[in-house]
Amino acid sequence: IQSAVGIRRAADAPLFLEQYLDQPVEDALAAAGLGRHPRSAIVELGSLASLSNRASLYLIAAMAAYMQQKGFAVATVTGTRRLRRIFSLFDLDLSTLAAARAERLTGPARDWGSYYDDDPQVLAAPVAHCFEAAVLKATALNVSKRSGVLDSIVAQVKELA
């Protein structure tokens, strides 16, 4: 395993990142200019981990393909400075919805060690933009021609649907 991510549909339960927002995620997205979307079209990514930037690229491409296949319109994530730098390497233009502050949480959820020292932000982007950015970056890096990885990811995601 080179990378992993958790995914939560907004239609299933409140998103963890909604604790950082002053309003429901669908209202925050509309206020940020990302359009009005039903909760069934919104997804939260969490617990992202990768061994390398290349593994992150594959993960982003796979998740974007999966989210498109499942009909999600907007992806949300709480990203630290480091994660935002990784996203910027892939030319992902994310909208900031709010700062993620420990004081917005209650109980054990507040006790994340030094996590909040890395300036986490609640971010969002259209799923179509995420996939396009990942494909463009892979093309620029000549990844897909060397290994066929992106084509393989898309084919595998379609088989899962």
Positions of the model-derived regions?
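Alpha-helix boundary/capping detector
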Residues: 71, 93, 112-114, 131, ...
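Glycine-rich, flexible loop segments associated with nucleotide phosphate handling
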Residues: 36, 116, 146-148
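Acyl-donor binding region in acyl/amide transferases
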Residues: 17-107
